[in-house]
Design a protein with these regions (language model features):
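Intrinsically disordered, polybasic Lys/Arg-rich low-complexity tracts
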Residues: 154-183
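S-adenosylmethionine/decaboxylated-SAM
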Residues: 3-8, 12-156
Length: 183
């Protein structure tokens, strides 16, 4: 994997950790990895590389507010690394975040640092498969900078149908038998 940009969002040690961590999390049921981050592309390349190495059908969806902040862009690093298992989306971050939650088995968040609790509630409410969430907390970057959670979908019990009894109308006409006496 080749990361072309000189700007590094995370240290080399943290990069190795996230690569190994995600690679270990990927299993045969993993379809999509959602990355919400600062658009330097370092983690995008790492996630795409881990996914490509472990399960070639796994796709990385990378979203950010804008995609031209850094040069060279993440797409250039992905292209030179021959990693084509990615989708890069920019703009309207909140909407894209909510749309892509349902598609992801693994979510990496390096954004929303001050509102992570509300974003976790959105994740809990919208996931449809068990999902692993990795949050990079820059305040803990001297230690292990990642907080990991697993969120399972809430399965609501289905309402049971009440047994309905159907009553057939009863014919209430009474027939009287009259006996005729014969003499």
């Amino acid at each position: 994997m080749t990361y072309l940009n000189r700007f590094k969002q995370i240290s080399d040690e943290a990069a190795n950790s996230i690569y190994s961590l995600v690679k270990d999390m990927i299993n045969k049921n993993t379809t999509n990895i959602l990355e919400v981050g600062t658009y330097a592309g370092q983690v995008t390349v790492l996630l795409a590389g881990a996914a490509n190495e472990k399960l070639s059908s796994a796709k990385v969806i990378s979203i950010d507010e804008n995609n031209d902040t850094f040069s060279p862009t993440a797409q250039e690093s992905l292209k030179i690394s021959n990693l084509f298992n990615t989708s890069v989306e920019a703009g309207d971050l909140d909407r894209r975040f909510e749309e892509n939650i349902v598609k992801a088995n693994i979510i990496y968040i390096d954004r929303f640092h001050d509102e992570i609790e509300s974003k976790m509630e959105i994740i809990k409410k919208n996931v449809i498969v068990p999902t692993k969430v990795i949050f990079r907390n820059p305040k803990n970057s001297s230690d292990f900078p990642f907080e990991i959670s697993e969120v399972a979908p809430v399965v609501k019990p289905r309402a049971r149908k009440k047994a309905t009894t159907t009553e057939e109308p009863v014919d209430k006409t009474i027939t009287k038998e009259t006996k005729k006496e014969t003499t």
